[in-house]
Amino acid sequence: MPFYRRTVVPQRLCPRNPPQQLAELRDVSHLAALSLLRQLADLCGHSLALLEDLEGHLLALGRRTDSLYRRTVRLRRRLPCRLLGPEEDEEELAAANSGRENATATAHSRSSWRQPVNVFLSSGRPPSVEELLREAQLNLQSLLQEEYEEQYSEARLVGQTFRSSDEATKPTPNPRPQSARRLEFILMPTKRQLSEDETTTQGVRAPEASLSLSTTADKQTAWNSLFPLPILEEKRWPQLCSTQSDIVPINISGQQFDKHASLRHSLFNTETAVNPKSTLRRRRTIIGFSNFSQRDQGHSNSPAGSVAHSTTSDIRPSHSVPEGVHGRVAVGQDARFPSLTSPVLRTPSSEPDEPHQARSGPNPPGMESMGMVYSVPSSCNGPTESTFSTSWKGDAFTYMTPSATSQSNQVNENGKNPSCGNSWVSLNKVPPLVPKEAATLLVARDNPAGCSGSAGYPERLIQQRHMPERPSKIGLLTSGTSRLETGPGGASRFRERSLSVPTDSGTTDVDYDEEQKANEACALPFASTSSEGSNSADNIASLSAQQEAQHRRQRSKSISLRKAKKKPSPPTRSVSLVKDEPGLLPEGGSALPKDQRPKSLCLSLEHQGHHSSHPDAQGHPAIPNHKDPESTQFSHHWYLTDWKSGDTYQSLSSSSTATGTTVIECTQVQGSSESLASPSTSRATTPSQLSIEVEAREISSPGRPPGLMSPSSGYSSQSETPTPTVSMSLTLGHLPPPSSSVRVRPVVPERKSSLPPTSPMEKFPKSRLSFDLPLTSSPNLDLSGMSISIRSKTKVSRHHSETNFGVKLAQKTNPNQPIMPMVTQSDLRSVRLRSVSKSEPEDDIESPEYAEEPRAEEVFTLPERKTKPPVAEKPPVARRPPSLVHKPPSVPEEYALTSPTLAMPPRSSIQHARPLPQDSYTVVRKPKPSSFPDGRSPGESTAPSSLVFTPFASSSDAFFSGTQQPPQGSVEDEGPKVRVLPERISLQSQEEAEKKKGKIPPPVPKKPSVLYLPLTSPTAQMEAYVAEPRLPLSPIITLEEDTKCPATGDDLQSLGQRVTSTPQADSEREASPLGSSVEPGTEEKSLISDKTAEWIAEDDDDVFVASRTTEDLFTVIHRSKRKLLGWKEPGEAFVGGRTSSHSPIKNTAESPISESTATAGSGSSANLDAGRNDDFKALLQKKGSKATPRSRPSAAELLKTTNPLARRIIAQFSKDYETTDNPST
């Protein structure tokens, strides 16, 4: 508040020296009451002072309002608004008076949405702002007076914007009658005439309106609040006029607009126009409708005039409607809309400037007949729209279409009456350009003009405006109907245009973009952006909203193309716009608009009519022409800035569309991942496909495949495709100026810029999550690993998601591969290690391998028991843990036998798969009394199959049903064997058999890399875990000692722990093989410590396990791990020499160590660890996606170093290991 700070100090709650002691309670009460009363009196005094201050402020505000109103009236009379007749002036005066009478209400209603603007009121404005405002007002006044007076005559002579001024002068007598046309406000004609005069300089006329509007849209918001009058819409409207001079600096010339904005310091409007980041800028520009018209008249020749217009327009949007200033009042509501409506837009709309001039010559008739939009600009706010239109993508074009076309558009988009169609179409088209609120204003204006939906629209507008203006607006709209339908029909369209321009601000989506724009564009000095946008959505949303949004996007694209010319980054938006074209097709349901856009420059009235409403909603169909011919310089420039910032600011209507803010809404998952990732999904995604097609056809973007949807370069893809579409078909087809092609290229760069933040951001997180999987070369294995992981634990589930998503990312985000590979290695390892029932997934993934593996194991098991220990035990455990966790009941018998294995599954769970489980079970069954080497070999192979499959069966039932059917069949066999095993269990012989098997694991290793990895890895790990044999032995021994049940209970517990930790353990085991080996044997080890000792002693001959300590085991394990990773990885696709040839060699080489130890206990636990490592490595290598370095130190190391996810997993695994290792140790 401006009030001076008042401090209320309690005078004396208690007198310092009370006359008498406070002996009684009543004395204290009296004293307290007295002090309280004193304080209340003091407060009352302060309140009175505040009220007086407020009264003074209100009086000053009223005075300012009156002066502003008078100024506005004078300005209106000066403006070249033929649409505004004396009636309109009177109406506006009446509206202003009513506004003054309702000053308080208006102020309140305004203050709600203008609250931010109020900050700039004289009371709260910073000195710098005050100076700017003063300068702006002076500039506006001088510019409006001098330029409008001078150019007024000039316009008549030259037929430029000031011709509109002439018209405005004529209508001045009847401004009230055209109050309904306020939307078309005469300013539009002024602008349009200005544009017409500048038709030769396409950039000047359209850019003028664009610049002014853009500038106004952005800055006017601030200005509206800055000016004391802005509180009331009327006052604001006049302020807009006065501010126009300031905004005038926002040149109308297409590209100069930026320069003008910067040079002139056109307040926020200029900067906003320069920096299209803010949707507000566009809106503000749009806002300058009425003033724009004035300014354009005066500004026809000079950018200053245009800026003035823009400023006026901006201010006016704040409260223009309340004043009902001129025919713009309708527009006035959306002051920015008027700006949009300015002839510049129309002029650009009518691609040929000459036609525009021609229309300008006979402003009312010519404009109307030529194209509703243009006729409107010429008659109403031609200059304003012109100025704005250029900058606002293609609004002018759309509106430029003939009234008939406009009508059809209007009917289609807004479903308004065709009779009002001419002006309506403009409005419809305007909404595409204008953000939602702009569209709403257009609707309101058009409806009154058309009379069909005038009541509803004006009401809505009024409600949204929250201003007394609304009633005036309705009246204006009503009178505007005649105006719109007659020569003013063009004016009405002009209004639409002006609205269209603001829509351009929110071109992306009527609903989505509008809100974003309103929010993002603080330019909502007038709440209309949001509220009106909502209105617009309501009114036109059903018909127009989507189409408009789509068209807006298209329009944005078109403009973006131009902007691309100016700046490479804008092309990004252009891309979105192009994508919008596809989006338009789906939403608008009119593919022609895209194609027609080039054709339906303002020149093609038909196209505009049929294509204008929707494409213009996007603003692109019209814009390309408008942009290239007139507004290319300015509009391109302005839009470029807008698009540039658009990447950052998603809420820019066009920018945001291009950026993908709105696009997300439309095409969240349409075609391009980047579209998805980026906020431009809705607009860009739908168009994304089209843009891709276009891209393929035109390959607009320089380093990107045109047809590529490239998730990582979604924007770039969008940019490529959309840009070509807009620039080639629209710009080249309709208006083939060099700017179109130029735009396309710059657009692509912008798109790329936008891409990294949107698509890259989105992708990177997702990619990271699924880094390992995406890199995985074989999705099946990866997925199976993921599935297994899910079985094993929570981590598994996460991995699964990663796997699925990762696969997508792998395909989608090849650009991100560098990152993904790093993560993939560690992640893949973690995945493999994690998968508890890896064998199961492996079966699914490599069912043939599994089928083969059992046979191979059996075959090999008979001749060579070596294979069994390495991988066989671990996978069964892994499956078992899932089985135990998921189906404890189904695995009871097996548990006894599997319990020993249970410790191992965590290690072998990675992808020891069937072979490992079989081997593991084979090992368990080997203990059968029958011949350990040979007899056991068959028994083992059978038992292992059953064992492996039993755990698999339970796990497969839980996780994959059907994959493990055979194992279940074996499970029955396993039952007896398991029982036999406890009896037969001579763990020593079993261990020996395991060693032998581990030494000769060719069958299993030969299995698919993942499957083999477990066997070989366990074999290698057996050597590593030679000191650990007890752990695996302990599980086996546990079966013996516990005979199933005890082991089952303990094993189940341990398995439960391991199952939970198996995914972790897998990665951890690689990190610390000993730990993993210890883990499996924690409970089992305790259960079977004696037998483990025996086993170890017996296996010592093969391995130096007997005297090994835990540290020794760790050392051995790590060493063996390195060997496995080092040896087998380089030699084999399956790291760890899973292949039968590598496997046998490695197993044989390491079998001396691992056979006895691994067979005893390390065989199961260490082998499982090694198997996991090998499996993991095999998976990594198999998934050639991430060619795993053959010389990997260890999965754990890789995980720790490369993947944060892996690091997390390792940490968890380490915890599990510690838990298990401590007990086992």
Swiss-Prot record:
Biased composition regions of type Basic residues, renumbered to the chain: 552-568
Stretches the record annotates as Disordered: 161-180, 193-213, 291-371, 466-510, 543-632, 670-766, 812-1009, 1042-1093, 1128-1203
Record keywords, A-Z: Phosphoprotein
Highest taxon in the source lineage: Eukaryota
Compositionally biased intervals (Acidic residues): 841-851
Modification Phosphoserine, positions: 500, 576, 691, 1054
Designated name of the protein: NHS-like protein 2
